Amino acid sequence: MSPLLRVLNRTSLVTQIVIGLIAGIALALLAPAIALDLGFLGKVFVSALKAVAPVLVFILVMASIANHRHGQETHIRPILWLYLLGTFSAAVVAVVASMLFPSQLALSAGDVTLSAPGGIGEVLQNLVLSAVDNPINALLNANFIGVLTWAIGLGVALRHAGETTRTVVEDLSNGVTLIVRVVIRFAPLGIFGLVSSTLAQSGLDALLGYLHLLAVLIGCMLFVALVMNPLIVFWKIRRNPYPLTLLCLRESGITAFFTRSSAANIPVNLALSERLGLHEDTYSVSIPLGATINMAGAAITITVLTLAAVHTLGIPVDLPTAVLLSMVAAVCACGASGVAGGSLLLIPLACSLFGIPSEIAMQVVAVGFIIGVLQDSAETALNSSTDVLFTAAACQAQERRSA
């Protein structure tokens, strides 16, 4: 083995990612032109993760259910409740923060031509239609709701198959997992390319005009990540939640921050769940499910930007409306993965609660795209790290009760 490979094997992946991050920042500041050219490293890494994620979820969930033995327990229901509780709590935090530190937006008359869903019913309808999508189409377009539906259906059907068939499915699962491990080893190079090209292309100039709004958004996400989520985890596992919380933020959140894709971070979360020794039948389903419906960061984005528009227009907000907004934001956030453009294009839906016309609401969406470099990164980091955090908390709570 060459000396370089020996050093790489001895150095942890997180350390390598931090080195790649620092090198990317340095290159963007010193040689922006070269940094832009090296952006293809990030594109290749994200494309590889996105390519392998649907296949991984499909094979892993199908294998997990097909090889599930009678008497084995999975803990999906408590994890699902944690996802919903975490998303609603995040929306409440965002409402409180927006009331304490109201943001103002410079809304102009410029037209923004984007297509947003017309109501909550349409979002839910899109989710149902995604669930019954053609399986090949679902895999090609990374429709994880459709992929999960077909994986669960085939898994249940194959539970009655012969032992040989189930062994083949398990071997396929192991093969795909090995490919994912190889892809993840290239994370430092990918993040180096992503950071260097993003900073060289956008810089930080575009963000300076929205510092207050960004401070409220990022502050809410940090509060949820470092206070609310640990409180929920403590309630579940009844011991110091911070070692687990910080581990998930370090191992999952950092990668998600730079890939800006919950789907692309699924392999990272699955690998972390395996290292934590969690129940495979549980995490192989809960992690892809979390990437679809566990959207605390999206709930914060929808709430903060909606209330920023409300404060800018001078619309009064009473307590019942604030509570309703929290509920709507939580439901919309759960449907964010079913909408192209994610949480930002669901803002007009929340704005409709206050009678804000679509033209103004879409200007708020445009503001969201301007600050998206940081907003989307922080949102994805919170969403994705919470998937593995709540999965680990539920599994550890079950182990504590069984002991």
Swiss-Prot record:
UniProt catalytic activity: L-serine(in) + Na(+)(in) = L-serine(out) + Na(+)(out); L-threonine(in) + Na(+)(in) = L-threonine(out) + Na(+)(out)
Name where it's found: Cell inner membrane
A GO molecular function for this record?
neutral L-amino acid:sodium symporter activity
**Which InterPro entries does the UniProt record give?**
Na-dicarboxylate_symporter (IPR001991), Na:dicarbo_symporter_sf (IPR036458), Ser_Thr_transp_SstT (IPR023025)
Keywords on record: Amino-acid transport, Cell inner membrane, Cell membrane, Membrane, Symport, Transmembrane, Transmembrane helix, Transport
Disulphide bond pairs: none
Kindly report the protein's main subcellular placement as a broad class.
Answer: membrane
How the protein sits in the membrane?
Answer: Multi-pass membrane protein
Query: What are the record's GO terms for cellular component?
Result: plasma membrane
A Pfam family this protein belongs to?
SDF
* Biological processes per GO annotation: serine transport; threonine transport
Bilayer-crossing residues are: 16-36, 45-65, 79-99, 138-158, 175-195, 214-234, 295-315, 327-347, 353-373
Q: What's the stated role of this polypeptide?
A: Involved in the import of serine and threonine into the cell, with the concomitant import of sodium (symport system).
PANTHER family attached to this UniProt entry: PROTON/GLUTAMATE-ASPARTATE SYMPORTER, SERINE_THREONINE TRANSPORTER SSTT
The family this protein is said to belong to: Belongs to the dicarboxylate/amino acid:cation symporter (DAACS) (TC 2.A.23) family.
What name has this protein been given in UniProt? Serine/threonine transporter SstT
The gene that this protein is the product of is sstT
